[in-house]
Amino acid sequence: MIVNRYKDAGVDVNAGYELVRRIKGAVASTKRPGYVGNIGGFGGLFDLDSLGYDHPVLVSGTDGVGTKLIIAQKMDKNDTVGIDVVAMCVNDVLAQGAEPLFFLDYIACGHNDPALLASVVQGVAEGCKQAGASLIGGETAEMPDMYAPDEYDLAGFTVGVAEKDRLLSVDTPQAGDVLLGLASSGVHSNGFSLVRKILFKDHDVKLTDKPAELKGKSVGESLLAPTRIYIKSVLPLIKQGLVHGVAHITGGGLIENVPRMFNDGLRAEIAAGSWEVPDIFNYLKQVGNLSDDDCWQTFNMGLGMILAVPADKKEEAKKLLLASGEKVFEVGHLSERTDGEKIFIKLVE
C-alpha cells in the first residue's frame, strides 16, 4: 500500500528497480584495478593502495552538462550526454595532473523512464571507459513538480590521484613553454545558453536544419557531438614529465581558462588562425552576429585542451599525441608578463 500511495504522489520505486536492472551490465563494464564491491551498496568503494602510488594526492571534480541537455531532450537523443558529464569532470582533474579513478553520477527527473535514463547511464559508462575510471555509484532522484515529466538534469563527481611530485600547479609552466592545442569535437558542454538564444529565440532555426555551413550535418547533430575526453592521450605525457601545464577550455572560453594554468608572472600569446575552427563555430558566429570577443570569451573555438610543454620537448609531445589519435596544433607560447592581460590573442593570416 505504501508503494502505491508513493506512486500516486508521482514516484515509482519499481521504475527505479527496473533502471538498476538495465544499467548493471554497463556499470560492470567500467571496472578497473582498485574497484571494490558491486552496484547497489550505500557507498562506492575504491582501494587506493592497490595502485602502488608512493605519495598519492587525491584530486576531485564535479560538474554538469548545463543546458545542452535541453537540446538532447528535444531531439530525444540521450545516449551521449553521459559522455559529456564524465568529460567535464575528468578533464578538470587531468588539468591538475591526476588520473581519474572513479565516477558517480546524479540524475534528477520529473518522471523515471527506465529506458531513457538507462541510455543516459550507458553514456556515462562509455565516458568512464574512455577515461579509465570506474562508475562506482550514483543517484536517480524522481522529483515530480520540481521537473516536468519529460525533463531531467545530469551531474557527476570524480576523484583522481597523482603522485605529489607530479601535480601540476600554476607555478609549473615557464616562460618559453610552447602551447599545444588539442582539437575539440565541437561546442562540448559550454555556451549553450547563448547557442539556444541565437538559434531558437533570435532566429527560428530547427534542430533538423542542415545549413550549408555545416556541410551535410544537422544543427542538432553538430551541437550534440560529445565532449572529447583527453585522459588516455595526455596523462602519459604528464607522467613522463613532458607537460608543465594543462588548461581545460570550458565556460569562459580561451580568455578565462588559459590563464588559469599559470601564475601572474606569465602571459600566453596565442596565434588565432593556427588551428582548425570547426564549422559549428563559424555558423554560430554568422547567425548570431557575434564579435571575436564574444567567441573567445564563450566557446572553445576548436581547442578543447591546451598544454604548456617545454620547447625542447614539443616534438616528442606532438609525436605521442598524434599517435594517440589527437589533432595537435602549435598555437602559441608563454612569455614573461610585465603588465597587461595574462592572455593575448593575435590574428595570424
From Swiss-Prot:
GO cellular component, one term: cytosol
Subcellular location: Cytoplasm
Pathway, per record: Purine metabolism; IMP biosynthesis via de novo pathway; 5-amino-1-(5-phospho-D-ribosyl)imidazole from N(2)-formyl-N(1)-(5-phospho-D-ribosyl)glycinamide: step 2/2
Swiss-Prot/TrEMBL catalytic activity: 2-formamido-N(1)-(5-O-phospho-beta-D-ribosyl)acetamidine + ATP = 5-amino-1-(5-phospho-beta-D-ribosyl)imidazole + ADP + phosphate + H(+)
Keywords: ATP-binding, Cytoplasm, Ligase, Nucleotide-binding, Purine biosynthesis
GO function term, MF aspect, one: phosphoribosylamine-glycine ligase activity
EC number(s) stated in the UniProt entry for this protein: 6.3.3.1
The organism's place on the tree of life at top rank: Bacteria
CDD domains per record: PurM
UniProt xrefs under PANTHER family: TRIFUNCTIONAL PURINE BIOSYNTHETIC PROTEIN ADENOSINE-3, TRIFUNCTIONAL PURINE BIOSYNTHETIC PROTEIN ADENOSINE-3-RELATED
The protein's name: Phosphoribosylformylglycinamidine cyclo-ligase
Organism of provenance: Lactobacillus delbrueckii subsp. bulgaricus (strain ATCC 11842 / DSM 20081 / BCRC 10696 / JCM 1002 / NBRC 13953 / NCIMB 11778 / NCTC 12712 / WDCM 00102 / Lb 14)
Gene this protein is translated from: purM
